[in-house]
Amino acid sequence: MNREYLEAKVDLCLNQAEIDIQQEEIARAIKNLERANSALSRIFNLEEEENE
């Protein structure tokens, strides 16, 4: 996966989590936050590989 895709996924998941929280869909919000976290981890792994 490329960096641009992962950054877009982070933004989308964070935005959806915010909507879920406003609608009191806490379980869905948590799942979207987990997805955002996963994408962020992949971004940082890409950066580490580039710096090696």
Language-model-detected regions and their locations in the chain:
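A ubiquitous short alpha-helical element
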Residues: M1-Y5
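Short, charge-rich amphipathic interface segments used for partner binding and complex assembly
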Residues: L6-E52
